[in-house]
């Protein structure tokens, strides 16, 4: 009988600890998802070719910053623009090698920072990133690119942003590089003993949107991705409509350009599927 009170106290202690962890997970959800960096470590001029340092506004008035790299005027793909939506960490100055690879395909490239990243105002949120991508899309439209000539390229979390843009606007193509199926799916993998699917308020549910999209899709994912497992890319690809292409990357999650020429080859093959590209 003397053990019962001790057992009760132990169970209460375990329960309270569990509840505390659950509350902390909810409290720190935003900081777990978004890792913005305000400091630009370079400018677009570092690429050694023409670029525009762009200021534009989202629909809620938030001022955003982006870099536009025009394609060479003699490029047969100069009429196409790649709208680059980066991942959850850093800012646009940390992806220069990726811009070089995209530009190597002969398209124009417009990279932008979500609110709260780099020189863009505000604080990031899921709906905020969606608004920001739409604002970047509208900037390209005003630049003279028809919607069907704009390809949304999403890196990791940016794939969720790009997929939502494809659901809201007309696009010529969609690229998902190392993109998870959803934040709840990722959370359940990282914390299988916590009810993350019911607690989370940030979703980026890419997979659920793909069956509704009617746009050419390229899924790029590495079998050795240690953060967003290969099965996420496979599931996203399986959920999408034709035409679609799956391209296995080399390297880890944060090193998609481990083989730059292989990366570019995947983009080239995808562009060949797009009418008029």
Residues covered by each model-derived region:
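An N-terminal hydrophobic leader/cap segment in hydrolases
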Residues: 10-57
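Membrane-embedded segments
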Residues: 59-139, 143, 148
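Short alpha-helix in the alpha/beta-hydrolase fold that links the catalytic acid
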Residues: 98, 206, 215, 229-238
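Primarily recognizes the serine-hydrolase "nucleophile elbow" in alpha/beta-hydrolase
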Residues: 136-143, 147-193, 209
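Short beta-strand/loop motif that positions the catalytic acidic residue
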Residues: 212-214, 219-221, 225
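Acidic catalytic loop of the alpha/beta-hydrolase fold
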Residues: 223-228, 253-255
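Catalytic histidine-centered segment of alpha/beta-hydrolase-like enzymes
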Residues: 252-262
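Catalytic active-site module of serine/aspartate enzymes centered on a nucleophile-bearing elbow/loop
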Residues: 260-277
């Amino acid at each position: 009988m003397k053990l019962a009170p001790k057992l009760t106290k132990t169970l209460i202690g375990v329960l309270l600890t569990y509840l505390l962890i659950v509350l902390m997970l909810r409290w720190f959800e935003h900081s777990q998802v978004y890792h913005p960096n305000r400091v630009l470590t370079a400018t677009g001029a570092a690429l050694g070719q023409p670029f525009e340092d762009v200021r534009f506004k989202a629909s809620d008035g938030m001022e955003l910053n982006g870099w536009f790299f025009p394609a060479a005027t003699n490029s047969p793909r100069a009429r196409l623009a790649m709208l680059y939506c980066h991942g959850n960490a850093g800012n646009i100055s940390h992806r220069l090698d990726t811009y070089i690879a995209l530009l190597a395909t002969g398209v124009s490239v417009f990279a932008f920072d979500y609110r709260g990243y780099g020189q863009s105002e505000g604080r990031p949120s899921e709906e905020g990133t969606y608004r920001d991508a739409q604002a970047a899309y509208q900037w390209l439209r005003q630049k003279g690119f028809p919607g069907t000539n704009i390809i949304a390229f999403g890196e990791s979390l940016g794939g969720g942003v790009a997929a939502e843009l494809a659901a809201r606007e007309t696009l010529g193509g969609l690229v998902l590089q190392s993109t998870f199926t959803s934040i709840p799916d990722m959370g359940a993998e990282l914390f299988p003993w916590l009810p993350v699917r019911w607690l989370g308020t940030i979703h980026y549910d890419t997979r659920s949107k793909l069956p509704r999209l009617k746009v050419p899709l390229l899924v790029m994912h590495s079998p050795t991705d240690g953060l967003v497992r290969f099965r996420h890319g496979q599931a996203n690809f399986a959920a999408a409509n034709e035409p679609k292409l799956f391209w296995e990357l080399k390297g880890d999650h944060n090193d998609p350009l481990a083989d730059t020429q292989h990366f570019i080859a995947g983009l080239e093959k995808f562009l060949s599927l797009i009418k008029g590209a």
